Amino acid sequence: MLTRSLVLLPLLLAPALAARAQSTPAAPAMRMAVRLDAERHDLVMEIGPLELPAGSGHQQLPAFHGVVPMSGWIHGFRVEMVDGDGNAAPRETVHHVNVISPAQRELFSQIMLRVAAAGQETEPVALPRMIGYRVHRGQELIVTSMVHNPTGQAYHGVRLRVHFPCTPSSAVVRPVSVLPFYMDVMPPASLHSYDLPPGRSRRSWEGRPAVAGRILGVGGHVHQYGTALRLEDVTAKTVIWEGRPMVDHEGRIVSMPVARFLWTLGVPMRPDHLYRVTAEYDNTSGQTIPGGAMGALAGLFVPDAPARWPAVDPGSPELKLDWRLVHTGNQGGHDHEQGHAHAPPATHGTH
């Protein structure tokens, strides 16, 4: 939360404080900038500057709203942290980043469309140039993020950057438009993290897609002690994907596998089928870890009939709750206040 400035001071202290203010310039305010590097075909969303003291805990940043400066397609994303000297900060200083399109809804629920999501174990996501997520000049995007610094070194003037490789709408060869989709083991528009009991455990959520289409790829995110994340077609009794995290020699998760179904023309998904996402954990600590578990899945989807993708329903209780959670920093289950929570727009349109 941004601290408020003290505006009324004892009169006797005013001269000394005024002199100090002249010699110590105020730290620049954190903000988000959106820019397009047309030569490199790189759309960049940058948040900063941030201060990351050594060993600092979780810091939920405000939900920043930005506007896309171009029309075209984006082909994946990557996240980087750069300090005030232009040097790369460790990837583990990023807890998570989410990019959200408030004018579009999700495939499995009424919540806002999650365009990109990354944790510290997320590798850069690169899509073939023949497919991409369609963006339009003036389209609003929201970026939510959490940072921390588990290292023994402080980092100053840090900037969090989300890079989107892109193709302009003027391109001769137009990519096939795809849409991201998101599923979570917690119900839509709720806290994403939950208490992790000791020993083996699992948690699931089930839902039906709003429209028919094909899954082109899928990946996911779990926390420490996570052993598997799975997507199933319950109706067909088949496992579409199962990912098991890679860990280092200390048991810390360093990456999650990603499945791609491009060359098989995708995995069919039907609205008359029920789908389940399941997270499995093996907590060997012997204690319940408050908010210690999470199971989130994201993928790429090509609808059979894009025009049938439902519009956002401004009156949906699910959407209103999602908007509030996004703007109070509680998506991940961490109790942090942040920014100013504006009311959701009265109407939305699809892109």
Predicted region positions:
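Bacterial N-terminal signal peptides
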Residues: 5-16
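Beta-strand-centric surfaces of beta-sandwich/beta-rich domains
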Residues: 22-214, 219-351
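N-terminal secretory signal peptides that target proteins for export/translocation
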Residues: 1-3
